[in-house]
């Protein structure tokens, strides 16, 4: 039985490292900085990235570990000989393999944070003089990366209006190398037509990179629509409980190879412990996401009918401008609800001060509901003009809907809005 033929839920649970001689049921934590070699030839071959030496697996035969028939829990192949945990680690490899299977990707690399994934992916693939075409609505740190740091290396970025995808090709130049977007976007929850982006990227021979953080592999798979690479901040819904940081990029093996070589030498690797936590978190991702989305839709419907709310954006609300696109490419609407509170920036601050149950935090995708006012927090370093350019108004509030009893979440938002 091949893992590719299994359901996503089964892949998330049963994709697992080969068992050791102890026949453990749950994968152990490989908390080690480095790995040993059997002899000089083993060491040479490992650094030369030749076929892994299997001397250490002498107890294993074609029927499985210690003669016990191989189960679907032991199906993913050993891709490399582990040398040093900055390069690879069994726990990290397992986590990456799960994401690859769930996203339909050829290969991947895991990072210490989501922004390490974003930076390393771009830095590995771009050269001085290259150009990026990006959606205007992107995460604040990504925007800062594009506008403040990349220009130091003569890498420029042009932004297209997420509500005017027909204008994308107007921004493409001879030196454009990457087309980039988030969908849904952070924090405005705009939706981009991934199929359209895929066609444009293919037509102009561009690398299409999609940040799939808000959707997760359970809700949306951008590679199906033509994306070359998919990025996740695993800190968010993949972990799901606000415990660890992590990021991952998956996609075409030739591009991942470049990202791997860059990251192997610059050191943004995910720690074995965090990889172990994140891999275990994926086992419950489908169940968690179903409940997150169920709660979020009810919260969005409540907010849409509140007199102190000017507007609400949630992908599966029929009032969302890109509702039809969302239904085409997303299985569910996600757990993020964005709404415009009447009264601009001061009203947003007062609303946060009145919150009692929900948490005030810059994170999202937690079991606990989180409320954020982007204009005064995550995007406060942008000018008002820059914020408006990325769909962030002074009254915008982002709610990461958690797993609490949904009526308790609604009651908290209701009293804070009054």
Give the positions of each predicted feature.
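Active-site C-terminal subdomain of aminotransferase-like
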Residues: 4, 14, 38-39, 43-44, ...
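PLP-dependent enzyme catalytic core of the Aspartate aminotransferase-like
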Residues: 106, 147-148, 156-158, 174, ...
């Amino acid at each position: 039985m091949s893992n590719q033929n299994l359901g996503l839920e089964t892949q998330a649970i049963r994709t697992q490292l080969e068992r050791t001689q102890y026949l453990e049921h749950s994968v152990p934590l490989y908390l080690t900085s480095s790995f040993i070699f059997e002899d000089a030839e083993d060491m040479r071959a490992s650094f030369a990235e030749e076929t892994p030496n299997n001397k250490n697996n002498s107890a294993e035969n074609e029927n499985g570990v210690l003669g016990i028939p191989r189960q679907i829990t032991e199906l993913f192949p050993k891709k490399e000989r582990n040398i040093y945990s900055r390069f690879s680690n069994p726990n990290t490899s397992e986590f990456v393999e799960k994401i690859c299977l769930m996203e339909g990707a050829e290969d991947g690399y895991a990072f210490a944070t989501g922004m390490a994934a974003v930076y390393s992916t771009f830095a590995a693939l771009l050269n001085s003089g290259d150009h990026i075409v990006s959606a205007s609505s992107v995460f604040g740190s990504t925007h800062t990366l594009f506008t403040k740091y990349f220009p130091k290396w003569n890498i420029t970025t042009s932004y297209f209006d997420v509500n005017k995808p027909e204008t994308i090709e107007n921004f493409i130049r001879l030196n454009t190398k990457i087309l980039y977007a988030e969908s849904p976007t952070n924090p405005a929850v705009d939706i981009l037509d991934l199929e359209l982006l895929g066609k444009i990227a293919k037509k102009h021979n561009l690398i299409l990179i999609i940040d799939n953080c808000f959707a997760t592999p359970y809700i949306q798979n951008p590679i199906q629509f033509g994306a070359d690479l998919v990025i996740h901040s695993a800190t968010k819904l993949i972990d799901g409980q606000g415990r660890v940081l992590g990021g991952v990029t998956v996609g075409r093996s030739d591009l991942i190879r470049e990202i791997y070589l860059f990251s192997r030498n610059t050191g943004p690797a995910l720690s074995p412990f965090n990889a172990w936590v994140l891999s275990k978190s994926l086992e419950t991702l489908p169940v968690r996401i179903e409940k997150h989305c169920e709660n979020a839709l009810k919260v969005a419907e409540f907010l849409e009918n509140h007199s102190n709310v000017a507007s609400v954006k949630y992908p599966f609300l029929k009032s969302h401008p890109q509702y039809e696109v969302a239904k085409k490419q997303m299985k569910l609407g996600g757990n993020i609800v964005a709404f415009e509170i009447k009264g601009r920036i001061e009203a947003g601050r007062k609303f946060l001060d009145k919150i009692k149950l929900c948490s005030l935090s810059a994170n999202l995708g937690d079991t606990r509901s989180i409320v954020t006012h982007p204009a005064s927090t995550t995007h406060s370093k942008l000018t008002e003009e820059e914020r408006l350019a990325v769909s962030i108004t002074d009254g915008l509030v982002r709610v990461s809907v958690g797993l609490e009893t949904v009526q308790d979440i609604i009651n908290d938002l209701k009293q804070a809005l009054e």
